Structure formats: C-alpha cells, structure tokens
Amino acid sequence: MAADYDKLFRPHEGMEAPDDMAAQPFFDPSASFPPAPASANLPKPNGQTPPPTSDDLSERFVSAPPPPPPPPPPPPPTPMPIAAGEPPSPEPAASKPPTPPMPIAGPEPAPPKPPTPPMPIAGPEPAPPKPPTPPMPIAGPAPTPTESQLAPPRPPTPQTPTGAPQQPESPAPHVPSHGPHQPRRTAPAPPWAKMPIGEPPPAPSRPSASPAEPPTRPAPQHSRRARRGHRYRTDTERNVGKVATGPSIQARLRAEEASGAQLAPGTEPSPAPLGQPRSYLAPPTRPAPTEPPPSPSPQRNSGRRAERRVHPDLAAQHAAAQPDSITAATTGGRRRKRAAPDLDATQKSLRPAAKGPKVKKVKPQKPKATKPPKVVSQRGWRHWVHALTRINLGLSPDEKYELDLHARVRRNPRGSYQIAVVGLKGGAGKTTLTAALGSTLAQVRADRILALDADPGAGNLADRVGRQSGATIADVLAEKELSHYNDIRAHTSVNAVNLEVLPAPEYSSAQRALSDADWHFIADPASRFYNLVLADCGAGFFDPLTRGVLSTVSGVVVVASVSIDGAQQASVALDWLRNNGYQDLASRACVVINHIMPGEPNVAVKDLVRHFEQQVQPGRVVVMPWDRHIAAGTEISLDLLDPIYKRKVLELAAALSDDFERAGRR
C-alpha cells in the first residue's frame, strides 16, 4: 500500500498562519517607530510568550555585580631625605580609588613580566678573576697589596639629580564597549621626595673619592701565526692555548710602564678578559714588603730593552721572576725557547688531554743481506747452457771446491814462510814437485815467491822452472851485503807466472859444498823481501846444507814414490824428524805419493794413503798422478799440465797454507 505523503506532511489544524499575518512585513529592529499592533483576531499561540529582550549585550551585564578589582600595588618606600637636618615630611595616606567597572571582555590581564635576559652562549658569566700580579719594579719588589685592594671595585652609587621631573601617569588602557563609556581610574603614583633647591648637597655616606676609570687596554698585538692558529695542533689543543693568543697581560704591563701611567691609589689593575680561563693564570706572588722605589721618569727608549741596558743584572732577575704563564701568553704561537716547569695537579687535571691522530710507528727496515750474484760457470754443461740460453745456473760443485782451495792459498802468513821439499831417495820427483808447487803458489797468490836449489849434488831446479840468467847462489854469496830486494833480484830468474828461482852452483865448476852458514846468509835477507821461500833439498838429512834448511823452515813436504821401498823411506824420514828435535815440522808435514811411471803400480795406493794418514794430519796426504808434460823433463808450464795434476798441486798448496796463520818463522 502506497503511503500518502500529502497527508503525512499536512500541518495540524490551527497551526497555519492567517493570510493577514503572512502578509506582514519583516520586523526591522533599527526602525524609529514601534511596530504596528497585532490585530485582535489573531489566534493565540500555544504556551506563554517570553518577555522581549534587548539586543544590546552591555545591558545584560549591567545588572550583574562587578567583580572586585585587583588590589593596587604597594607604594614604594619613602626615599632618604638629602638634607641632613630636615626631617622627612609625612605624606598623606593615599585615598582608596573607586572601584572601576568590570570590562565586558572580562578581568584585565596581568601586566607582562619583564623579559628574562638571554643566557650567554659560552655559559654562565664566570666570576671575576683575581687581578694579575703587578710587574716587579727595577729597584726591588713592590709592596704587598691589601685585601681591600685585591677585592674587585664596587660600582658607584647613582645620585638622584636635582629637580628631576616627576614620572607622568601612564594612561589607562582603552576598553571598547557598546555600553556607556566609563573610563578606568588607576591608583595615583606616590610623589617623589622633594629635593632642596639652592642648598649645598649633603655629605654622602660613602667616601667621595670615586674609583678612577680603569686604564684603557691597548689593542692586542699578535703575530700572524697566533692569529692564524697553530697548524700542527688539534682543536682541543687550540682551546687550551687560548690564554697565549688572547690579550696578553705582559703586553699591557709593558704598555703602562712605557707610557709612564700610574694607577690611582684606590684602584687596581683591570682583571683578565672574560673569555680566558682562570686556571691557566699563575697565582700572584707576594714578595716581602720593601720600600717602593721611585718610579723612573718616562724616557724615549723605555721598555725591556732600556731596562737591560741600564740594569742588566736586575733585568735578568726580573725575567727569571716572571711566571711562565705570562711568558707563554706573550709568546703566542711562537715556539718556546726554554722548557716550561711542571704544572701542579690542579692545572694538569683542568688541561684536557690532546687527542691527535694516531700515528703508526714505522719501524726502520733493516737492510736485507743481498746475495752476491752468481758466478758464471767456465766449464762443463753449465757453461754451455749459459752460452746458449743466457741462463746462469751458477757454479758446479767441482768449481766451488776449486774456489775454496784458492781462498785457502791466498791466506797471509805471519812473517815469511819457508817450505822444504825433502826425501831420502833420489828420483822421487822432488825437483819437479818444487817447480810445480812454486808456480802454483805464484799464480794464485800473485806475490813474491823465491825457489832455492839447495841440492848439493848438482840440482837442476832452474832448468825445470826456466833459466834466464847464468847467476847462481855462489854469485849471491860473493855479495858483501844483501840489504835491498834488488841485491837478490839481480841474480834470480823468473818464469811466466812470476816465480823467481836461484840455482845452485855448477857441480863441475864448484870449489866447495854449501854449508849451513851459506844458507843463513841467503835465507835471512830473502825472508825480508819474499813472502814464501821454497827449498829443493837433496837426498838425506845429514849434509850441512839440509841441516841449515831444516833449522829455518816452517813447513816440510816428504816425497815418496809409488813403491814399497819408497813408502818405507818416507816413513823413516818422518820418524827421523820426530827423533831429532823437529817434532813441530813432523806434525805439520805433508806426504806426497808421486807416480813417476805410467801405468798401474805394483802396490795398492789406497793402502799407502791409509798408512800415512795415521802419521800426519788428515788431508795432508796427496797422490800425484803421472803427467806426460812432467815426464818430458823440460821447463814446466802450468798451462801444459793435466787438470788432475794441477788440482793435486793446488790441494797440496792449500794444505800447506792452513799453517800460515799458526806458524811463523822459526
């Protein structure tokens, strides 16, 4: 069933306005005439009609009682009368002002509080520091200041000017309202104390001497480094050292001393700047009170330089008496020339620790031992590899062993070292061995070496070394004195490796045999001019020349052939040396087993070596092979010798050289 909307929204009977009321115009509140009365035939509305209200909001609150006004501020105290004899006149009590009406907007807001001064950025204002110590006068210490002088100066008491105008009353704030205007009345301000006009000012309660103004501080003069800051310091260290870069106290004292300005007796020197910490200022020293010296008159050239010129001793004392903190302040960023004294525990605790960048300590690197370059091999397959590929494989073990033998041969003997080549049987190869041994020593050592033919039975040493001169030992014995090297060199012959040889006299033309005295006459000067002397002795030990040789030599070589009888004779020679007072020669003796014939011998060489190793030191038994060049019987040349034979001769020379540092000339 559909709803009947016309019936639902139809007004009730009697609620519709009549036609004449609907035609009434809109009420105008600003009209100057009253509205027309309603017609009598209008229907009476339901309920009671509320009384008419006024549109003026101010009339609504007039009937309400106004709130009590705030209490007036208490009057200021009556000032002290300036005239001493005139009592203060009593002021009439101020009449209580009428209560002002309550404003429409509510109670009057409280007056704003004065703004709080802003907190300084650097923190609360520090307490005024103690005044710095005045400079030490030239003639002596200054008097001790009293406590009143050490106290900071009090600000002067402001005096009320005569005939000051009275403070005008502040007008009451204007409060707009739609109601009747009622001005707000404020409490009258208390009147100012009357000042007597035309009378002298009364005596003040405080001393009339007002503190003099502090002397003007000169502009801080700093070096360019101080203004720029220290480039090697961190931020923490720069904050610590502000006292040195700020206005220095010593500079101000110098300026006052140079200008001749003197402070008033009641004043004190100006305190340190507020931006500087007080803990870094040295405490004032109180010297013993003495009579103050007369202040010198200001001169043209005043200051520290003038004081040093006039009183050098006092200037030195004055410089020593100044605290280090003031000196640090004057130097600024400059480097201190003298070490500062140790600070006390308080100053050390206040000074922050310097936190600079951590520098890693670099340990000095020790120079690494560089290995010597490899020596290029001169023979064998290593030599061919280096020649074809330029790859250096170093020396072979055989070449290293040969270099070690050369190093042993090059040892320096203690004085002159003489070597005797002996044997009990002729034909064992003593002469050839002496020539080969001497040539090897001369080639390796490259110094003066002399080979003497001491065989009384027609020796041929000069023929195997190489004869160049016809002179013999007999010609040297004919000299009256052998004091120079050339006295011997004039009679010797030299081969290709610089080995000198002095042959024996010709057996066919000899008048007599050589004696031990003849040997000493030649051997003594030869030991002064030659480092090594070799003697080729004959068979046996009983001839006087061989006895003379054994009395001066330091080493001996016993030669034996590869045979049973040759080995037996070599053993007998060693026993004879031990039994006849040559034990030292027998202990250092070398045994040479010489192959004088080609082919295999009829005895075992190893058995002979084992036999002689039991009588001499290890490594002093050398087996010499048969060599074709040696068997030819001509002049011996090292280049024509077999490499094996040359190696055995080198080993013999190295074995004899081991005693160069232990045994000297006999």
Swiss-Prot record:
Single GO MF annotation: ATP hydrolysis activity
Any one Gene Ontology cellular component term annotated for this protein: cytosol
Effect of residue 425 to Q: Does not block ESX-1-mediated secretion during ATP depletion. Lack of ATP-binding
Residue spans of biased composition, Pro residues class: 64-80, 87-144, 188-205, 284-297
Annotated Low complexity bias: 22-31
SUPFAM superfamilies: P-loop containing nucleoside triphosphate hydrolases
Chain residue ranges for the region called Disordered: 1-378
Amino-acid positions noted as binding ATP in the UniProt annotation, renumbered to this chain: 424-431
Biological process according to GO: protein secretion by the type VII secretion system
Composition bias, Basic residues: 222-231, 357-371
Keywords assigned by UniProt, alphabetized: ATP-binding, Nucleotide-binding
Comp. bias intervals (Basic and acidic residues): 1-15
KW Cytoplasm (keyword) present: no
Disruption phenotype: Double espI-eccD1 mutants abolish EsxA and EsxB secretion, but not their expression. One group has shown no growth in the human macrophage-like cell line THP-1, no cytotoxicity, attenutated infection in mice, nearly 100-fold less bacteria in lung and spleen of C57BL/6; Brodin et al., attribute this result to polar effects on the downstream gene. Another group has shown that inactivation does not abolish EsxA (ESAT-6) secretion, EsxA-specific immunogenicity or virulence.
Role according to the record: Required to repress ESX-1-mediated secretion under low ATP conditions. This function requires the ATP-binding motif.
Subunit record text: Residues 1-81 interact with EsxB while residues 35-186 interact with an artificial EsxB-EsxA heterodimer.
Protein known as: ESX-1 secretion-associated protein EspI
Annotated source species: Mycobacterium tuberculosis (strain ATCC 25618 / H37Rv)
Originating gene: espI
